[in-house]
């Protein structure tokens, strides 16, 4: 392996990999064809939330490990570069649909079996939160594991940490076609299958920084530390334009109904981007088949921000130590004819 490692892509996977290699003492140069966070990592939401704990599998375990380690990982990033990534473990609250109590009880049992004890779920009739969604059943499911991060601040914090540790970031220039870690988002999925999925989100001006995030009827509502609340997002397959439209307005309206505290908060920013969804629906991490010295870190889709620390650590272990901790389902496989 060359003394300098090239990373292609300035989204969350590329930045996390570059940081992990830099903090382990390797010289890194990251190329971003546009600017840091120009793609799917430049949105608003930043929900670091676990998958439902039922039907446990390797992907859920990797995500859980990353969520548990996130507090220390992001604290180190912020300290290294002097930029706050906007991370906080504030928990999550979800309304329970009428008749779903038995299913929620099973979910709570599964969380006890797989999550750390401190992170467990519970049902409550009296949620202690500034931002409480409407619940037709009068019950809410809460957890203490879920965290939030500001995607744009996270990208800026990682870039600052990389540079502070001697790494180089080149914006406005694509990476050369040479051995590298390829973390190029939806555009980089073509050899492996998968597709880009459009998402739209909005940012409201409302200071609820310490409130837990809300997940209700498919909508994420995330209070951030800077006096804003993020709302998202749409899931639009086979749509590649980056314009916001009436689908986002419907999400905003729905969020205001679900959380009446948002009713009068003004919208201060709207965003649309293309998220990379791998064919397997799991992240792609590992060597690029048939291209010695080339590696892939892609397919974060909706969980890229949550998974990035674990993905970066597993790839660094493989590249630097020859230690393979990557679940078999994550290894990149070329699509037929790819």
Predicted regions mapped to residue ranges:
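Residue-level detector of alpha-helix initiation sites
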Residues: 11-12, 35, 302
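Glycine-rich FAD pyrophosphate-binding loop
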Residues: 23-42
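Dinucleotide-binding Rossmann-like beta1-alpha1 core, especially the glycine-rich loop
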Residues: 46-129
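C-terminal catalytic lobe of FAD-dependent flavoproteins
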Residues: 266-338
């Amino acid at each position: 392996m060359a003394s300098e490692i090239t990373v292609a892509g300035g989204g969350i996977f590329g930045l996390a990999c570059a940081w992990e290699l830099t903090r382990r003492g390797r010289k890194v140069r990251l190329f971003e064809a546009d600017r840091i966070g120009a793609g799917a990592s430049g949105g608003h939401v930043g929900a670091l939330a676990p998958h439902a704990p039922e039907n446990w599998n390797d992907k859920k375990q990797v995500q859980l490990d990353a969520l548990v380690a996130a507090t220390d990982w992001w604290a180190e990033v912020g300290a290294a570069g002097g930029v706050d990534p906007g991370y906080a473990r504030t928990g999550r609250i979800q309304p329970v649909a009428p008749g779903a109590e038995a299913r929620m009880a099973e979910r709570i049992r599964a969380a006890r079996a797989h999550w750390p004890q401190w992170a467990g779920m519970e049902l409550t009739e009296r949620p202690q939160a500034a931002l409480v969604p409407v619940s037709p059943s009068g019950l809410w499911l809460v957890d203490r594991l879920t965290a939030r991060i500001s995607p744009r601040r996270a990208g800026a914090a990682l870039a600052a940490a990389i540079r502070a540790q001697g790494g180089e970031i080149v914006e406005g220039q694509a990476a050369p076609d040479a051995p590298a870690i390829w973390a190029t988002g939806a555009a980089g999925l073509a050899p492996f299958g998968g597709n880009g999925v459009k998402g739209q989100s909005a940012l409201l001006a409302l200071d609820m920084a310490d409130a837990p995030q809300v997940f209700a009827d498919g909508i994420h509502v995330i209070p951030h530390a800077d006096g804003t609340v993020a709302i998202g997002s749409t899931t639009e397959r086979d749509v590649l334009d980056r314009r916001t439209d009436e689908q986002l307005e419907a999400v905003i309206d729905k969020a205001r109904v679900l959380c009446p505290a948002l009713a009068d908060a003004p919208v201060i920013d709207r965003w649309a981007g293309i998220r990379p969804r791998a064919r397997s629906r799991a992240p792609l991490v590992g060597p690029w088949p048939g291209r010695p010295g080339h590696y892939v870190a892609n397919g974060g889709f909706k969980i890229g921000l949550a998974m990035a620390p674990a993905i970066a650590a597993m790839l660094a272990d493989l590249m630097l130590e020859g230690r393979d901790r990557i679940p078999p389902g994550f290894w990149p496989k070329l699509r037929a004819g790819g």
